[in-house]
């Protein structure tokens, strides 16, 4: 059995959690650390000692390995701010905008910047962490164009041409679902799913999204998550599924803009949910490799090294 030596320590440090990987040159994880302290939960001065304590064993065994971090760790409220790179932004622009966070024990941590864009009205949009995943997907698939979907609390739909992110939109799908379910009248009749394979409610919600015609129709269709329960048209455990399908379906219809295929990047369960909704709506969503963040960080590290030569 061949041994792949570690090439870097990859850190995906978001708002509420952290994952670190001891990775080889192909982005495969040789070891993994998960922690529940997000970048925004720490005060200034706490990030470096916290990360150093998590990575101490790896750095003791591999003292010269570079450490690359992406996500909210580079936000203004994070460890060290890595200002947004403006679209269009590809590997060269993102690698050139990385920032080194000082750390004697870690040898400095290279932080990947986020990316900013403006829509047709001039309204700004931002992402942090997703740009690294997009770069990783591009490297894995060896192509330089396409639509990339990154579902989550704040889902992103990124458009790539010539290897550069030329624009993207954020949809508050995950956060809107949680808020409506947990803090409005819609959640009062909802119950946890009994059978994870039961898709009646989810499919009904996606179908409802496909029928939306006017901007306010989504708000009307959302209220059906209550009335379907009141009149027994859906069991309690399918009401949240209906709401999820409605919001995910509305996002896909808005984000796809008539495009019939895209690449989806994210956690397997969420990717599968989007893939199912896309199939109902005629949009083929193909999953990207699970290690896109690490692959993107490898590309950024190489790009930064090349720029320095």
Task: Please give the residue ranges for each predicted region.
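Short glycine-aspartate micro-motif
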Residues: 8-12, 66-68, 146-150, 263-264
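Glycine-rich phosphate-binding loop plus the immediately following alpha-helix
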Residues: 42, 115-212
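Short glycine-rich, Thr/Ser-proximal phosphate-binding strand/loop in the N-terminal lobe
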Residues: 3, 7-46
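Glycine-rich phosphate-binding loops at beta-strand->alpha-helix junctions
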Residues: 17, 260-277
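Glycine-rich phosphate-binding/hydrolytic loop that grips phosphoryl groups
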Residues: 286-309
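Adenine-nucleotide phosphate-binding core of ATP-dependent small-molecule kinases
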Residues: 211-250
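N-terminal phosphate-binding loop and adjacent alpha-helix
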Residues: 29-65, 74-81, 188-189
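Short beta-strand-loop/turn "lid" adjacent to the catalytic site in phosphate-handling enzymes
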Residues: 58-124, 162
